[in-house]
């Protein structure tokens, strides 16, 4: 009995030394609850990511495992090295960009697409190491950052509506409404409203509940075939290590690589700042602790993710749900990572999720990301026009890269045309010139 108590106290002492629980005003129990809460809000990614990457021709069972592995790796590393209550997983938006645009629309092998993700992650890692990342964040205007986030939201939302069958291709009008009486459409729409209603009532597992309910209804209608719940993890040999580094070093992919890097730069940085701010972890000068370590872990996770066969990795805003119930240290993130490792044994469940069950989650994420348009100064056209062009051109051109390019260029045009040259930072000018060169010398040929 005494030996057991000694073992427990030594274990708690180790956690105290690693995570400084008392200093942050928290306990092991609180951190465990926070980790479980964060996990419930983001576990949907293990069902949605395989669905999306499956469009690119990747083995969905293997992607399920690699999604769990990289989420576990990134979250545990964030907890141990940065001691922040922030979990990581493959980024929604960039996974859709990879599957629907880079592979499906551009006709590239998914291995080459993974290579583009790798080089984008390496670029992000170098920007972090040499502190250029902080300079770019500070010098790219809010309107462009918001336009990029919102444009990806519109792009994801469109993919969700397409996967649910709500919108379909039409040669005369480009798109038109689908068969709304089809049960797949009805279930996809139902799934979205389940998420929206539960989320508005602060139910943390809203997305997970929606996926479970719509999958069960699909099973009752004969769309889903029960294959079990628990099994040994599927093989990952079909995706792990199949990244084409040489094939992706192509001048024609420069814009794609830059897009992966730039979007991940803003996404992770914004999430890390937002979550740590909500946790009250800023110091007396308003600076956030261990941000360099956090950004480093984020970049390394994306590099690792491309090698094992999954899309760009980012910090998840869903981490704020764990913070809201008391998560203050990296122990929260470690708990999330451990739970993702346990989920690997539930691979049969992931294989049963139909496309329309995941569609509701895509539409919901689109709503969340598009809401950032409210931050644009709409009464200032030099800010509103670039934000609008960036956002709408992503879904309309079916390319996140083109949306970013036209947004940066239009920002320079508006500022130069109105004589507000002081608003143009060197960063914006350099990026805009690079995109102009891409359009003239690469896209034109």
Predicted regions and their residues:
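Loop-to-helix transition at the N-terminal end of transmembrane alpha-helices
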Residues: 56-76
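Membrane-embedded alpha-helical modules
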Residues: 106-216, 220, 334-445
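Juxtamembrane transmembrane-helix boundary signature
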Residues: 2, 71-92
